[in-house]
Curated annotation (Swiss-Prot):
Keyword Thylakoid belongs to the record: no
Keywords associated with the record: Cell inner membrane, Cell membrane, Membrane, Protein transport, Translocation, Transmembrane, Transmembrane helix, Transport
Function, in words: Part of the twin-arginine translocation (Tat) system that transports large folded proteins containing a characteristic twin-arginine motif in their signal peptide across membranes. TatA could form the protein-conducting channel of the Tat system.
TM stretches of this protein: 1-21
GO cellular component, as recorded: TAT protein transport complex
Listed name of the protein: Sec-independent protein translocase protein TatA
Main subcellular localisation: membrane
Chain residue ranges for the region called Disordered: 50-95
């Protein structure tokens, strides 16, 4: 009743083809397809850029965790005792 029937759509399509011609419609369709493809490429490149930024942001945190772990190991190692043992072993080698 209030909608557009299939026959009305066909008549509109026929009028558009008569007005613009098939060559112009073909080039318009190609241009529209190229624009959609460019838009999709831009969207995926933005997503890739965000993923790289997220990975770059996570990497310093991982490096900081490694440094903290190394610092904990260094704190627990008896440095003074190790230095004394090295001095004793050098004294034994010289003797």
């Amino acid at each position: 009743m209030g909608g557009i029937s299939i026959w009305q759509l066909l008549i509109i399509a026929l009028i558009v083809v008569l007005l613009f011609g098939t060559k112009k419609l073909r080039s318009l369709g190609g241009d529209l397809g190229g624009a959609v493809k460019g838009f999709k490429n831009a969207m995926t490149s933005e997503e890739d850029k965000k993923a790289l930024e997220d990975n770059a942001a996570d990497k310093p945190a991982a490096d900081a965790a490694k440094v903290t772990e190394t610092a904990k190991v260094a704190e627990t190692a008896p440095v003074a005792e190790t230095a004394e043992k090295k001095a004793e072993s050098k004294g034994k080698e010289q003797a």
